[in-house]
Amino acid sequence: MKLELLFQNIANSFAFHNQIAVAVSGGVDSIVLLHLMTNWAKKNKLSLPIALTVNHGLRSESQKEADFIISYAKELGAKESFILNWEKQNIKGNIQLQARKARYKLLAEWCKNNNVKCLLVAHHKDDQAETFLLRLERGSGVDGLSSMDYKSFLNGIYIFRPLLNFSRSEIERYAKLHQLRWIEDRSNYDLKYRRTLYRNLLKASDNQDVLTERICLTALHMKRAAKALMHYTRLAFDDCVNVHDFGYIEIKLSEFYQLPEEIALRLLLYSIMAIASKHYKPRYNSLIVIFNKILQKGSNVNCTLSGCKIRKYGENILIIRESSKIQEITVHLPLNGSIEWDNRFSCTIFGDQECSVTIAPLKKTQKIPEFLKNYDYCSEVYYSLPTVQKDGKMLAYPDVNYNGKNTDDDKVRFIINSTIKQNLVSLISI
């Protein structure tokens, strides 16, 4: 069958990964993907895939469906199968969007924790067209209207979409030919969801396949335009932005004002996302208000967005982490290796004493030591920095200098390395 032959060619792009996981919702598309993947692995004498399913717990039958997936995945030849449960807390707004974010977070975290570098998901051509129409309705820009990538990168995990060039009808024909079983999600027919409306709209067209193909072609044009814009955004970062060792970003206004507005807006956007370490963009309506304020050359800029402070400081715009949004973490000393803090720093603590300590931001009630003041930064930068504390007592301030002194008695040494450049690379690479 055409789909099976084409899949074998596509699979060569991720064949070098020793272990591969497949996200299985139980729908026909993910069941077909798992079936294709297990057959391909057997034929090529490679490691069988791991099946992962997320139980969102949103419907009474959720657990029963998850159990079916685990059992059927084993029958189809999966090496192992796991249920990942979503621990829901105070869900607000769009439940489908929240569930999607949680699903990707759970899948990526499991892969990362189990040293699996490759995750397959079952998006197909019809998903592409429906997503385009949904985003068009919301007024999305070039990025939002771009086609989904065959390969993307999330939290250190490669995500592949091998079925992206196949239609739902092709996938269903394959499933029926191989007598596969799958779950029909009732929400796919619920008209309260906008995606269902657009799915039905496509079905009602005179030639669904042609219309879907043309929508996907437009999305591909948008993808090319987005890549061109990203190229020039990266060049603008080289000219306009300083990423500081102490965990903040400085944008030179003299250069910023010379940029085309679209490039300048993207530069501001990705700077905020890199400091906040978020892969989801802040709301456009909130971002554009701040952007327009920055463009007013005489205006005072002092705003917050997405867990960041955006403020004018001299001839620059500073993007600083908002201290109230930073989570403290507790670690036990002596620490073996480094530890990540706030997705902005890799922290190393040198000291022989055995005890539990807290890595927490410097509070405004605590003094700023002279060696930090000598850097002559905006005061809010200091309050976004990590410190080592025990029972409320300061054990060590941060430093980027291995030969410096950042504590009164030197029993504890605390060295920080900014990871913001890595955050930026993951955001603006194409």
From Swiss-Prot:
Its EC number is 6.3.4.19. It holds the Pfam family ATP_bind_3. GO terms for molecular function: ATP binding; tRNA(Ile)-lysidine synthase activity. It catalyses: cytidine(34) in tRNA(Ile2) + L-lysine + ATP = lysidine(34) in tRNA(Ile2) + AMP + diphosphate + H(+). Its main location: cytoplasm. It is an enzyme of class 6 (ligase). One of its GO terms (cellular component) is cytoplasm. Keywords: ATP-binding, Cytoplasm, Ligase, Nucleotide-binding, tRNA processing. The keyword ATP-binding applies. PANTHER family: TRNA(ILE)-LYSIDINE SYNTHASE-RELATED (PTHR43033:SF1). Ligates lysine onto the cytidine present at position 34 of the AUA codon-specific tRNA(Ile) that contains the anticodon CAU, in an ATP-dependent manner. Cytidine is converted to lysidine, thus changing the amino acid specificity of the tRNA from methionine to isoleucine. This is tRNA(Ile)-lysidine synthase. It comes from Wolbachia pipientis subsp. Culex pipiens (strain wPip).
